């Protein structure tokens, strides 16, 4: 309210003239005697603009208003009054001019302490002017410059202050409840304020510049475009989805499937980021559902295709498939291979259809009453191998025909095998699908085929026929493998088992044949091998000859050598021959006969098995078996030599002396006459007396020596079959006798030099005469 006391508070300009106090009436100043100043009217400040660009404009405005309200005053002043004043005032001044100056100073003084700005003072005056009727103000009294004006202004100030205080009191009383609430909420508000302050502290670094926001907006727009592109590339259109579910299976259908597989591949990348995992899972789920629908349609299409083809083939024979249909079929097959369950069900269905048809065709070949067959397969007891071959030949023809069909249908065309196709992930599984199906189909037929063949193999006991069966089975196994049948398939396993069975039947049938032979034969007078052994060797040689011709080496096992060669000779033959000559250990003559029949038997073995030495007996074990046979043969010959040598010395009465000299030093090792001295110690033996020697040797020597050659060749060794062995035995025995006769006679001459006549009468043959009698040249 300080503006109401403006006359008392205004600071005059230092350069202006001194003015009377505001409590003095301006009328007391008789500056203008000619005309009394009219009543001053306060200008309506509300009608004037209050907005100025600067202080100078404001001053100019109010100065013009003041000058307009002041009339020109008379310059004629009374000399009495103007005289004292004219010294102090340079020009006359009116009351209106003073008031205008006061108001102008009030409104334009920037340093007035009671006001904060000119706008507030102007606003106060405008409010006072607008409400003067409500306040009942008398402006004439308020602006009066006398004491009454001062009192009115002070009274107005007091009224306004009381009114303001009452208004403020009412406002404060009304705000007490609000203050209480604010006080109650001050704690939470303070905490909120602190939290906001902390939040402001943390967000002080955030820069919300326009360029940054604009760049962010551009990024979001670009991201939106990318997302739209991704959405278009990772989703199916309504037309594509409808064609996938209801459309024809054609190139467009396969293009949609390729798109689905592409989407699935890209969706897996979304799973690598935690932010996009849920999107990737949802996308994969949707695409998998679409693939399930498409795989069901493809499965039904493939089944209908094969069933239709099979039906037409039964009615009109094997049909050919068009290129377009075959391409759609194989492309569908490629896409179905991604679903293991549907694909395996389809393959099982194919295997079932084809195997049933082939089984019917196979069984119909054995129907004699089937008039459609020109030549049914009939089992013949006279030619079981022919029946076996016919069955295998028909099986082979079925495999060849089925392979051609499967190859034309399931072997993928080269243009379908591309690097960017679905096949690249399934090539290992679907690449040789026609061969896999072929093996699966004939796996279903394997048991039926095995039953037809096993009845021949299991009940055939002829080793020759069994060998033919082995060859037939081995040949067809090789042919079937060449035409796509796996060696590990059930059909090949069955054929291999039958081959092994037939191979084992060869050994078992030969051993059964040997067991059935009559071995209760008496000793032959000619000391030839037993008849049963001759028959067995003949059978065995025929078998070995066939094995050699057919180059069948897998049957040449250790078991075959043992059961067919060693056991019959070592157990059956040797025991049988020993039973023929039970006194061979005691009687030298029986032992000679036993050795001769053994040599004859081994010579027969050698003649029968010798031709197979480099073929049948080429294996390590075969060589050892053949070596054992030769060793036994040589051992028998050696034993016969020793026995015949002993028989010769015994027949001439010189056996005791021969043994005595060999105990001292082997006769065979004597080189010259110097070695004779080693036998001089034999004189100490009683049998070395000349009289005893004469009694033991003279008569037997003269009796047997002339007959020795005929006795050896025509009696004892007459039945020995190998002439070389006979010649070797004769020459060895006679040579030993001549050498001993010479040494023995020379030693006696050294021991008894004075009894030369006695020695000559006992050993009355010279060395040359003995050599001549025995037919051996004296060396």
UniProtKB/Swiss-Prot annotation:
Location in or out of the cell: Golgi apparatus membrane
Membrane topology: Peripheral membrane protein
Entry keywords, A to Z: Golgi apparatus, Membrane, Protein transport, Transport
Record bears the keyword Membrane: yes
Similarity field: Belongs to the COG6 family.
InterPro entries (alphabetical): COG6 (IPR010490), COG6_C (IPR048369), COG6_N (IPR048368)
Species the sequence originates in: Kluyveromyces lactis (strain ATCC 8585 / CBS 2359 / DSM 70799 / NBRC 1267 / NRRL Y-1140 / WM37) (Yeast)
Stated name of the protein: Conserved oligomeric Golgi complex subunit 6
GO CC field: Golgi membrane; Golgi transport complex
Protein role: Acts as a component of the peripheral membrane COG complex that is involved in intra-Golgi protein trafficking. COG is located at the cis-Golgi, and regulates tethering of retrograde intra-Golgi vesicles and possibly a number of other membrane trafficking events.
Pfam families xrefs: COG6_C (PF20653), COG6_N (PF06419)
Cross-referenced SMART domains: COG6 (SM01087)
Keyword Protein transport annotated: yes
GO BP annotation list: intra-Golgi vesicle-mediated transport; protein transport
């Amino acid at each position: 309210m300080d503006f109401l006391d403006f006359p008392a508070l205004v600071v005059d300009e230092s350069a202006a003239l001194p003015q009377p106090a505001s409590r003095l009436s301006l009328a007391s100043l008789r500056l203008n005697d000619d005309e009394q100043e009219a009543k001053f009217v306060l200008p309506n400040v509300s009608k004037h603009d209050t907005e100025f660009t600067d202080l100078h404009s404001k001053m100019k405005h109010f100065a013009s208003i003041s000058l307009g309200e002041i009339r020109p005053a008379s310059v004629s002043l009374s000399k009495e009054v103007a005289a004292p004043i004219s010294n102090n005032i340079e020009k006359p001044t009116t009351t209106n001019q003073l008031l205008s100056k006061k108001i102008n100073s009030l409104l334009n003084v920037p340093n007035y302490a009671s006001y904060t700005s000119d706008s507030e003072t102007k606003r106060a005056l405008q409010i006072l002017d607008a409400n003067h009727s409500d306040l009942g103000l008398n402006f004439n009294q308020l602006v009066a410059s006398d004491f009454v004006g001062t009192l009115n202004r002070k009274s107005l100030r007091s009224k306004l202050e009381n009114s303001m205080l009452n208004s403020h009191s009412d406002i404060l009383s009304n705000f007490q409840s609000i203050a209480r609430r604010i006080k109650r909420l001050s704690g939470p508000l303070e905490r909120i304020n602190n939290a906001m302050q902390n939040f402001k502290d943390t967000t002080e670094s955030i820069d919300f510049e326009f360029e940054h926001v604009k760049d962010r907006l551009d990024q979001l727009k670009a991201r939106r475009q990318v997302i739209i592109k991704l959405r278009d590339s990772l989703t199916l259109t309504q037309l594509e989805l409808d064609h996938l579910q209801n459309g024809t299976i054609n190139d467009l259908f396969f293009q949609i499937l390729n798109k689905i597989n592409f989407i699935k591949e890209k969706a897996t990348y979304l799973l690598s980021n935690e932010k996009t995992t849920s999107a990737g899972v949802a996308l994969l789920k949707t695409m998998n559902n679409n693939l399930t629908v498409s795989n069901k349609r493809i499965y039904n299409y493939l089944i209908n295709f094969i069933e239709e083809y099979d039906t037409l083939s039964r009615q009109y024979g094997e049909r050919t498939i068009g290129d377009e249909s075959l391409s759609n079929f194989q492309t569908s097959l490629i896409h179905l291979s991604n679903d293991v369950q549907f694909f395996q069900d389809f393959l099982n269905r194919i295997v079932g259809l084809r195997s049933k048809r082939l089984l019917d065709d196979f069984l119909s070949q054995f129907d004699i009453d089937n008039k459609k067959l020109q030549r049914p397969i009939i089992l013949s007891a006279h030619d079981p191998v022919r029946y076996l071959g016919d069955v295998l030949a028909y099986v082979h023809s079925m495999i060849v025909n089925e392979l051609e069909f499967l190859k034309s249908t399931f072997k993928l065309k080269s243009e379908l095998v591309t690097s960017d196709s679905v096949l690249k992930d399934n090539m290992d599984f679907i690449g040789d699908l026609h061969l896999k199906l072929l093996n699966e189909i004939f796996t279903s037929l394997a048991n039926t085929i095995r039953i037809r063949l096993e009845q021949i193999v299991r009940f055939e006991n002829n080793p020759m026929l069994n060998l033919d069966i082995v060859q037939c089975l081995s040949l067809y196994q090789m042919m079937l493998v060449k035409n796509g049948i796996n060696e590990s398939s059930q059909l090949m396993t069955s054929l291999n088992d039958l081959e092994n069975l037939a191979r084992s039947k060869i050994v078992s049938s030969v051993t059964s044949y040997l067991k059935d032979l009559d071995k209760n034969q008496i000793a032959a007078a000619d000391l030839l091998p037993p008849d049963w052994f001759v028959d067995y060797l003949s059978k065995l040689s025929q078998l070995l000859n066939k094995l050699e011709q057919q180059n069948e080496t897998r049957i040449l096992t250790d078991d075959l050598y043992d059961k067919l060669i060693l056991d019959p000779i070592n157990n059956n033959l040797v025991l049988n021959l020993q039973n023929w000559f039970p006194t061979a250990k005691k009687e030298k003559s029986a032992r000679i006969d036993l050795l001769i029949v053994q040599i004859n038997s081994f010579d027969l073995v050698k003649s029968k098995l010798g031709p197979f030495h480099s073929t049948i007996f080429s294996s390590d074990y075969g060589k050892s078996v053949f070596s054992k046979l030769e060793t036994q043969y040589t051992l028998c010959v050696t034993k016969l030599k020793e026995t015949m040598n002993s028989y010769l010395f015994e027949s001439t009465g010189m056996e005791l002396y021969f043994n005595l000299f060999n105990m001292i030093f082997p006769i065979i090792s004597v080189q010259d006459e110097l070695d004779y001295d080693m036998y001089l110690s034999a004189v100490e033996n009683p049998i070395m007396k000349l009289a005893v020697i004469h009694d033991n040797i003279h008569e037997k020597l003269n009796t047997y020596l002339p007959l020795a050659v005929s006795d050896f060749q025509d009696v004892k060794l007459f039945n020995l079959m190998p002439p070389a062995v006979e010649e070797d035995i004769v020459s060895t025995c006679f040579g030993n006798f001549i050498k001993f006769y010479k040494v023995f006679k020379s030693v006696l001459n050294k021991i008894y030099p004075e009894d030369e006549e006695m020695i000559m009468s006992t050993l009355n043959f010279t060395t040359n005469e003995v050599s001549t009698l025995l037919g051996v040249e004296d060396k």
